[in-house]
């Protein structure tokens, strides 16, 4: 539901505040369920604090652009849904929090049997209050090749309801009244968070044998179909120095990916990401014990957004890298890959002035402290 912020009264909690609270509730739940994620958050905050202490200019810049307070907050999470009715209802749930679907991603092109969108705030004020977004994928059961498994998957999904009656009632109330009171907002966040919690018991009717068959067909299918609900797949905080995070994760007991994905650190564009590898968790399939591997912790370092011209150059350079050096699964050529990546991206201007001059990136402009001192004064010359 799209809510008019101007219609909000003092008796209602704003959708932006509800989203910010929901993000914190999700973070607390995930820290409890996946202790390694709590360790990751502590590391991110330690690194960000060190970077800001060592770079007063960066701290001042972030203070002026209203970004400092939310540096270490989670930027996004990811979930996987099983049927269209779940997507329809989750859109209403996110709508209460001012989140709208943005973009469409057909992941079948990457041999993943889902298509996806991202739910987030779409205006500057909302993003400033809470940038949290949820990447939401929907299973395409028609792409399950085995007819027997496909029919069983559809049967299991048809039987489940991932939304509680109180949550449905609160969504309907928010849509009807135009918002939620403080008490209702608290109940809403509690019920909404339950949708994404981990269940150590598989869905009714899922045996260990069936789970293995689903997993062998596609791990994503098993992750969606064989559980009672769409447990959060990962959460992603933001760091100011991802290479330090990458180096320090093993020191704190986390099994980090072999390389940081994205452009090299010498080229501050787009997004760089890394994560600790998905954990193996115990699951009960009726009377049998089993395991499931899906959930992990991710980190991102955000830089300049690219124009179409900039994105074209980025894609060309990355394709050149992958044609020559592909990262191996065991990490044995990580140093070679990173060196070739850094060398290749020297063709991309690494400084903001060069990017702006060549029309490669987007920029926002803010009044500096010096400019504010002269606010309201006519220029001496034009």
Where are these regions (language model features)?
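Extended, well-ordered protein cores
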Residues: 2-382
